[in-house]
């Protein structure tokens, strides 16, 4: 197994950085910038697989299912990060998108020895969440071979949940354990084996697509505005009011009035103005349209 790991692209040495310790600060920064430019290129061939994965996630959401990210180390932390951002950005409940990391919450800041090597822990974490066939599980592993993730994917398959894998090596082992496999290969790292670099960036870019596009497709967005944002601080209140301006064409003062009248709900404010209806009528329309602004506006 040790020799197998050493053959992975993510573990390889990058010839461009062989003399890294002798390079100037600027030269290293330039090299890292050049290498980072390869990340988006590595994702392009996988866009069809990414789209297929998003379709599974959307189906799960429409069945009141959840999106669960599973990973260890950097991969796990990225999953937790993306899940956490869905709450303020799209107004989701914390349970709707969750990130699980091998070793539990403490592993976000401190390495938990051996946690990623036990496939049973991955399965147990999903059992503890009471995973159902309506859920979607995304297994994250830059190496493509993390036992914790494989155990989770196998359990999810057994339950009947949608399964997606994301790895940064070709022919990854976890690809054999998922319904949809995504393999992005940005190549060896500037610092050999440090997958928090290009591999981590690639994973985050894919996660951005999975969560954002899924939310677009379940009506969390109107045009390109995040109209389900939760205005939990001053910045977000300002953003919410501005979105009402942009969506309706009203003045800043009128947007503020709509925002207040709609109980600080951007969607309700937009429907009130564009459909010319009361707060209660706008709320009823949105309820009938399952929260989709365009559909609510089309109702009579």
Curated annotation (Swiss-Prot):
Pathway: Amino-sugar metabolism; N-acetylmuramate degradation
Enzyme class: lyase
GO molecular function, one term: ether hydrolase activity
Catalyzed reactions per annotation: N-acetyl-D-muramate 6-phosphate + H2O = N-acetyl-D-glucosamine 6-phosphate + (R)-lactate
Active-site positions on this chain: 85, 116
InterPro entries per the UniProt record, alphabetical: Etherase_MurQ, Glucokinase_regulatory_CS, MURQ/GCKR, SIS_dom, SIS_dom_sf
Superkingdom of the organism of origin: Bacteria
Sequence ranges assigned to domain SIS in this UniProt record: 57-220
EC number: 4.2.1.126
GO annotation, biological process: amino sugar catabolic process; N-acetylmuramic acid catabolic process; peptidoglycan turnover
Keyword terms: Carbohydrate metabolism, Lyase
Tagged with keyword Secreted: no
Family, similarity comment: Belongs to the GCKR-like family. MurNAc-6-P etherase subfamily.
NCBIfam families xrefs: N-acetylmuramic acid 6-phosphate etherase (TIGR00274), PRK05441.1 (NF003915), PRK12570.1 (NF009222)
Biological role: Specifically catalyzes the cleavage of the D-lactyl ether substituent of MurNAc 6-phosphate, producing GlcNAc 6-phosphate and D-lactate.
Subunit architecture: Homodimer.
HAMAP family in UniProt: MurQ
Remaining remarks: A lyase-type mechanism (elimination/hydration) is suggested for the cleavage of the lactyl ether bond of MurNAc 6-phosphate, with the formation of an alpha,beta-unsaturated aldehyde intermediate with (E)-stereochemistry, followed by the syn addition of water to give product.
Name of the protein described by the UniProt record: N-acetylmuramic acid 6-phosphate etherase 1
